[in-house]
Amino acid sequence: MSPSTTEVGGLSPASQLAASNTVHFPNESAEYRTARNALLAEEIELRRYLERVAAQRRALPPGGEIPRDFELVGEAGPLRFSSLFGDKNTLMIYSMMYGQARKTPCPSCTSFLEAWNGIVVNLRERCAIAVTARSPIDRLIEYKKQRGFNNLLFVSDMSGDYTRTYVNPKDEDVPGFSVFSRRDGTVRHFYSGELSGAMADPGQDPRGAPDLNPLWTMLDFTPEGRGADWYPKLDYKTQNSK
C-alpha cells in the first residue's frame, strides 16, 4: 500500500495527514522524523485498508446452513451446537490443538486463549464465544482450571463431527476460527479463517490477517519484531514447556 496523493471517497490523502503531524520527541534527528512521518502515512493507509477488508467481510452473502445441529459436550453435560448462541445472533468458536494424542495443550493456542480470556466479558456483550477441542470434557475443564480461564466456555468435540466439517476434514489436530450467524432460527456459517500454511510468505509462519493474537501484534511494535525462532511456551519456569 502506498500513501494516497489524492482524496479517495472524501478522505484526505494519508500523506497529507502525515505531513500535518506536529509530534516530536526529545533529541530525535531529522532523519528519524522523516522516516516516522513516512511510516505514519503507511499506518493511516493500513487503518483504512483494514476497515475496507472488514467491511467486505461484513458484507459477505449468507453462508451455508449448518448440515446438522452438532452434538457436543459442555461442562454441564451434552449439548447441541445451536445452544452455544445463548441469546446472541452471532457465535465465535475457536478450535484449539489439544486432541487426545497430545500430551499437553498447544502453547500457541494457549497464548491466544490467554488474550481471549481477558476480553471475553466485553465480547459477550456483542456475540457468543466458545472454545472446542477433541479432548474429553474433563480434560478440558482441568486445563481451564490450570490456566485460570474462568471466563471461557469450553466444549468437547470427541466425535470430531464439528471439527471435520468446519476445521479439517482429515482429522488432523489443527487450529481453526469460525463465525456463525443465527437468523430466524436458522444457523449459518458466516466466516472461517482460510489462510493456510501454503499461503504463508517466505520467512514467515502462517498467520491470519489481521492476526487474532495480540501477542504478535504487540511484538510488531518492537525493534526486534516477532523473532525468527521464538514461540510462546506453557511454562517459562521449567524445561517442560513446549
Q: Can you say where each PLM-predicted feature lies in the sequence?
A:
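Thiol-based oxidoreductase modules, predominantly thioredoxin-like and allied folds used
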Residues: 122-139, 150-161
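Non-globular targeting/processing and membrane-anchoring segments
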Residues: 2-121, 125, 143-145, 157-242
